Amino acid sequence: MAEMNPAQGRVVFEDVAIYFSQEEWGHLDEAQRLLYRDVMLENLALLSSLGCCHGAEDEEAPLEPGVSVGVSQVMAPKPCLSTQKTQPCETCSSLLKDILRLAEHDGTHPEQGLYTCPAHLHQHQKEQIREKLSRGDGGRPTYVKNHRVHMAGKTFLCSECGKVFSHKHKLADHQKIHTGERPYKCSKCGMLFMERSTLNRHQRTHTGERPYECNECGKAFLCKSHLVRHQTIHSGERPYECSECGKLFMWSSTLITHQRVHTGKRPYGCSECGKFFKCNSNLFRHYKIHTGKRSYGCSECGKFFTERSTLSRHQRVHTGERPYECNECGKSFSLKSVLIQHQRVHTGERPYECSECGKAFLTKSHLICHQTVHTAAKQCSECGKFFRYNSTLLRHQKVHTG
C-alpha cells in the first residue's frame, strides 16, 4: 500500500474549523449557531471514533492504522489560533483552551468514571458541548461553514460556480446548467431535457399516465411534488401571506408569483418576440405560439390544442359538462373563470376601474370597451359619421359595402 501523505495523515479539529471572536459570534443568528453546533458535534464524534485529536495539544496522538480522513476545503482563511485558556472547569476550576478540551477534561473527574466505554464517554462529551453552546458560553466559538470530515471520501467541485457534490454523476448533471447540454429528447414532440428523469415525467403528458393519486379525492398527478402541493387544498392551510395586500396562499411559490402584481416584475422573457411574463409556466405556454405545435387533439371534432388543459375545457362543448356551480343561485358554468366573474353579480365586486373617470366594471373586457369613450371617436371614411366603438363602426360600414 502506498505511504499515506503526511498532509492527510493527521487531522485535528482546527483543520475543519474557522475561529471567530466572541464579538463575531454575537453577530450570528440562531439558525447559524444551531448549524455550527450540529456540525461541530458530528465532526467531534467522527474524529473521536477514529482516535484523532482535537487540537495542537494532542500532536503526538497516533492515527488508527488503515484509516484515511479526507478534509473538505475550508472556504475562508484560518486565523492564527489563540493559546489563551478561557474555559473554566466547574468541578476543579482548571482553565482549558476551548469547550472541546473542557468536555474531554470533564471526563477525568471521579463522578464521571462510569463512562468506561469510549462510545459512552464521547456521547457524554457531546452532551457537555451541547449544554454549553445552548447557554451561549462557548468562549471563542468555532463556526464550521457546512463543511464535514468525510472518511475515505471524495468531493467533486464544479469549476464554473464552485458548488461541491458528493458524487461524480451529480456533478455531471449539474454542469449541464453551464454548458446548456440537453441530451434527452422526447420522441413525441422533440423537446429536449437535461435529465432522463425529467424526460420521463414529461412523457406522461403524451401517454396520459398519472401515477400519483390523492387518497382524499382520487385526483391523479404526473409527479409526486404536484400531489404534495394538491393535498394542501384538503387541509385548507394557507401559511404564506402577502405583506402588501394580506392575501394568503398555500404555497410560497404562488406568493412569490403574486407579489409580482405589486412590483410589476416580469422576469421571464421570450427569446423570439421579447415578451415578458410573471411566471415560467406562462412563458412555456407562450413559446408554443412560435413553434406552432398543437399536440392535443379532440376526438370529437379533430381540433388541436397546445395544452392538455385547453383540450379538456374545449371538450365540455361536446359533453355539455358544467362543473363549476354558483353556491348563491345554483347556476353552473363550464369554466371556473366565468364562475368567478358571475359571482361578482352577487358580491357587487367591480375590480376593474377606469383611470380616467373612476367607473368600475365586473370584467377587464368591459373596462377596455369603456375606455374607448375617452379615446378619439372612430370615423367612417365613406360618410364621415363618428362612432364610439370600433365594432359599431365595422357594422355601420356594411351599409356602404352591401
UniProtKB/Swiss-Prot annotation:
Signal peptide: none annotated. May be involved in transcriptional regulation. Belongs to the krueppel C2H2-type zinc-finger protein family. The keyword Signal does not apply. It is found in: Nucleus. The keyword Nucleus applies. One of its GO terms (molecular function) is zinc ion binding. This is Zinc finger protein 547. The lineage of its organism: Eukaryota, Metazoa, Chordata, Craniata, Vertebrata. One of its GO terms (cellular component) is nucleus. InterPro entries: Ikaros_C2H2-ZF (IPR050589), KRAB (IPR001909), KRAB_dom_sf (IPR036051), Znf_C2H2_sf (IPR036236), Znf_C2H2_type (IPR013087). One of its GO terms (biological process) is regulation of transcription by RNA polymerase II. Residues 11-82 form the KRAB domain. Keywords: DNA-binding, Metal-binding, Nucleus, Repeat, Transcription, Transcription regulation, Zinc, Zinc-finger. A zinc finger (C2H2-type) spans 87-109, 156-178, 184-206, 212-234, 240-262, 268-290, 296-318, 324-346, 352-374, 378-400. It holds the Pfam family zf-H2C2_2.
